[in-house]
């Protein structure tokens, strides 16, 4: 093989004397060029480490990046500019300015809630802090339907789209060009041709299949399709932080769907290379829907600079249910680390039970400490993780937490019946959340997420029964299992833990 390559190069240089002269010039100056490359790489590493010290949020992260940037800059400098920037200040400032255009609508929604007597005062501890973080209010008069797995979820979403009379809002991180994506497209095209306004927002990095040519049928039917970018141009595809990880569908401002499922065949368990897919979504009706709509409006305005005319008249659910719920959109442009503080508050509020399910479990030290303190208070703390995963690095990192959690009595389980992707918490038989946020740094600080929080004993009971079945379909994991593994596996686990801030 190498001989063939040598012959090809020889023939090429024979035909192109200028290239041959250039190659000879490079060979003669190889040592000097390598020296200059070495100097340039380390200078770039030193300058980038100054930026890392100024911008990385934690001391541990700043130290890790500084060491890497100054010792192996050839790898770490490009890695930092792709993964490491947790404060893209220009974007954050622009995003906050953009929110000013939608703030009056947001405020009017909150005023309408109060005027209609739809604001709730849940007995859940620290609810005021949650409302201030969310910039939303807990509302009464909602109903919720728990949707377990993809078939139930997309059946519900497609039925809801069929019933739309005014508009449909669709926002997903991933939309595939497969059977499921095609079915969604068909239904949206059909509604648009009936005169219903249809808006679709997708993340450009999460949905690389959706090139402009594949969107022609949607646009020809009158569907307004936009992509979510953090920067303009080709550079956006290299910006892996600040992605829009939300999964939202809203119909007529009266019904919304939120949860862990993207649009694709694998999310319905139809990809033989992945197998069964375990996930959770929720359908809500009532005044909380317009809180979800606020999040969509803000994202849409960022992507299009358009303010949509939507229904902002909050009404109780037609079912007559009075569930208390709150919509919590979070993202890197928030003035506080909203997602981090929300889940820390939830952990600290637990007095009896704290069960959480997350496909990506890479908590930082403050979350590990909060979970340990909850267990020491006598709270039944359980963590449900996938056994089969689509991210080996995250799975390796997850092993590193077993000893810290087990020593205080926290029980860790790995789900056995397929790939588990749900993002669910259950607290004290009253409070539960379903949404898009994983238990990792990327969801807590770097991505746009949305979580639906419920303070309702009956609905929390449904979530409890669902999780009890999931725990029954899982196996307990002990720290001894890691100790019994070989040295190189344990070494890989520790190395993966070092990369937790960028996972």
Feature roles, as predicted:
Residues 1-341, 345, 349, 389, ...:
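N-terminal localization/anchoring segments of enzymes in phospholipid and broader phosphate metabolism
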Residues 223, 377-379, 410:
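Glycine-enriched alpha-helix->loop->beta-strand junction motifs that scaffold or abut catalytic
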Residues 356-358, 415, 434-435:
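Thr-Gly-centered strand-to-loop micro-motif
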Residues 365-368, 395-397, 426-427, 445:
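Histidine/acidic-residue-rich catalytic or RNA/ligand-binding cores of hydrolases
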Residues 423:
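Catalytic-core elements of nucleic-acid end-processing and repair enzymes
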């Amino acid at each position: 093989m190498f001989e063939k390559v040598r012959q090809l190069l020889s023939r090429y240089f024979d035909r192109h004397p200028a290239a041959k002269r250039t190659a000879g010039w490079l060979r003669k100056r190889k040592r000097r060029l390598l020296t200059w490359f070495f100097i340039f790489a380390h200078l770039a590493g030193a300058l980038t480490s100054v930026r890392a010290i100024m911008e990385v949020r934690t001391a541990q992260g700043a130290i890790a990046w500084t060491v890497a940037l100054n010792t192996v800059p050839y790898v770490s400098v490009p890695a930092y500019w792709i993964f490491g920037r947790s404060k893209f200040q220009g974007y954050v400032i622009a995003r906050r300015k953009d929110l000013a255009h939608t703030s009056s609508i947001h405020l009017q929604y909150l005023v309408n809630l109060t005027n209609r007597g739809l604001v709730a005062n849940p007995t859940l501890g620290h609810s005021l802090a949650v409302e201030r973080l969310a910039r939303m209010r807990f509302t009464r008069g909602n109903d919720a339907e728990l949707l377990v797995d993809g078939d139930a979820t997309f059946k519900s979403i497609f039925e809801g789209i069929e019933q739309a009379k005014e508009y449909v809002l669709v926002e997903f991180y991933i939309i595939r060009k497969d059977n499921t994506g095609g079915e969604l497209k068909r239904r949206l095209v059909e509604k648009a041709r009936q005169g219903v306004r249809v808006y679709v927002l997708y993340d450009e990095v999460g949905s690389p299949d959706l090139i402009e040519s594949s969107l022609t049928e949607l646009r020809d039917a009158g569907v307004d399709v936009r992509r979510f970018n953090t920067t303009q141009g080709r550079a956006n595809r290299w910006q892996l932080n600040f992605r829009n990880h939300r999964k939202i569908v809203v119909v007529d401002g009266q019904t919304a769907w939120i949860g862990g499922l993207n649009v694709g065949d694998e999310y319905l368990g139809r990809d033989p290379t992945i197998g069964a897919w375990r996930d959770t979504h929720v359908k809500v009706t009532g005044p909380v829907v317009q809180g979800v709509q606020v999040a969509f409006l803000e994202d849409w305005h960022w992507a299009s600079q358009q303010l949509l005319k939507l229904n902002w008249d909050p009404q109780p659910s037609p079912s007559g249910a009075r569930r208390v719920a709150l919509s919590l959109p979070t993202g890197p442009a928030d003035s506080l680390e909203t997602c981090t503080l929300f889940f820390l508050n939830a952990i600290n509020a637990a007095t009896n039970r704290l069960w959480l399910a997350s496909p990506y479990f890479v908590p930082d030290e403050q979350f590990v400490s909060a979970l340990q303190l909850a267990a020491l208070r006598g709270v039944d703390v359980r963590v449900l993780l996938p056994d089969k995963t689509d991210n080996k690095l995250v799975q390796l990192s997850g092993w590193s937490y077993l000893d810290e959690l087990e020593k205080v009595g926290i029980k860790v389980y790995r789900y056995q019946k397929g790939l588990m992707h749900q993002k669910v918490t259950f607290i004290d038989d009253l409070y539960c959340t379903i949404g898009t946020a994983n238990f990792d740094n990327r969801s807590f600080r770097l991505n746009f997420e949305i979580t639906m929080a419920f303070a309702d004993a009956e609905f929390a009971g449904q979530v409890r029964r669902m999780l009890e079945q999931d725990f029954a379909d899982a196996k307990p994991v002990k720290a001894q299992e890691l100790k019994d593994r070989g040295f190189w596996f344990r070494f890989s686990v520790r190395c993966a833990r070092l990369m937790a801030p960028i996972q």
